[in-house]
């Protein structure tokens, strides 16, 4: 039988984080995960810290911040490498994903640089 303790934070020096879902201060540590008894959320504190540090900042050609799921437009004609096709200016890409690398926007079947895109 395992005993789980609920610890109420008394001072800011405690190591127990608030629940990221409901911000409850009543959390407990269960082997490798933290658990919130109020909302039932379970999380690994290392994952949350890594996701905060790894925020990807991508700007379009006009300096606007791009986010996951945005719609973007091409600002100039681009030749596809290894093909005779050309992507025309004004082509709209929906629901983009941001990734690390020199081609930092994933538009589904192709990857593009954010400098050739503007937010729609």
From Swiss-Prot:
> Which GO CC annotations does the UniProt entry carry?
cytosol
Q: What organism, scientifically named, is this protein from? A: Haemophilus influenzae (strain ATCC 51907 / DSM 11121 / KW20 / Rd)
Name the Pfam families for this protein: YjdM (PF03831), Zn_Ribbon_YjdM (PF08274)
Instruction: Give TM regions.
Output: none
- The encoding gene is yjdM
Q: Which Gene3D superfamilies match?
A: 2.20.25.10, SH3 Domains
Family of this protein: Belongs to the YjdM family.
The uppermost taxa in this organism's lineage are:
Bacteria, Pseudomonadati, Pseudomonadota, Gammaproteobacteria, Pasteurellales
Protein name, as recorded = Protein YjdM homolog
